[in-house]
Design a protein with these regions (language model features):
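SAM-dependent methyltransferase catalytic region
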Residues: 2-198
Length: 198
């Protein structure tokens, strides 16, 4: 099985945390059930046990394909809407190395999309956008326990801190507006209302 297709990192991790990764075939089959949402740049995805990002990486790949088709004629537009696609992805994992790998994997997916077409080249603002994308993944892919809805330390032990997600929206032009939401409050209410912050 290819490195990207391995389903476990070690037997010890399976015993300790029940960690098993979903193979690409299953990821695609499940995401195809909600295909329209995976191709909607604005649709939000939360993976409560994101591992190193198998699901989120494929969702981002699909969203970037849509961005390339719609906005690939303008580097500036492509950067803006590919950035927006990144802001819609959220993940939680109890393993610190998985969180770091997921963030890096998603950033590499976003960064790797440049140069895939004659028009999709980094704009003059690319470095700023790249820093913003990294910041989004730092805020959206979190070290935590989705069952207890709390942050965890580097050893997976619950802390007395709730998981807080950040919603990103364009206010005007390229200005961003952020709102924070507690995971437990979102689940308690069933669904967050747009713009409803904690």
């Amino acid at each position: 099985m290819a490195d990207a297709e391995r389903q476990i990192k070690s037997k010890a991790r399976v015993r300790a945390r029940g960690e098993v990764f979903t193979a690409a075939r299953e990821v695609n089959a499940m995401l195809d059930l909600v295909k329209d949402e995976t191709e909607n740049i604005d649709s939000t995805f939360l993976e409560p046990a994101c591992g190193d990002g198998n699901f989120l990486d494929e969702v981002l790949r699909r969203k970037l394909t849509v961005c390339r088709k719609r906005y690939g004629r303008s580097s500036t537009d492509y950067e803006k809407f590919s950035f927006l696609a990144c802001t819609t992805l959220y993940g939680v994992d109890i393993m610190a190395d998985n969180v770091a790998q997921c963030r890096e994997r998603l950033f590499k997916r976003w960064e790797g999309a440049f140069g895939q077409g004659p028009k999709i080249q980094p704009s003059d603002f690319h470095d700023r956008v790249a820093r913003a994308v990294k910041r989004v993944f730092e805020k959206n892919i979190l070290l935590g326990n989705a069952l207890s809805m709390k942050r965890v330390d580097d050893h997976g032990n619950d802390l007395d801190e709730p998981i807080i997600f950040t919603e990103w929206k364009f206010a005007t032009g390229d200005k961003l507006k952020r709102a924070e939401f507690r995971f437990d409050v979102l689940l308690e209410k069933g669904a967050a209302k747009p713009g409803q912050a904690v």
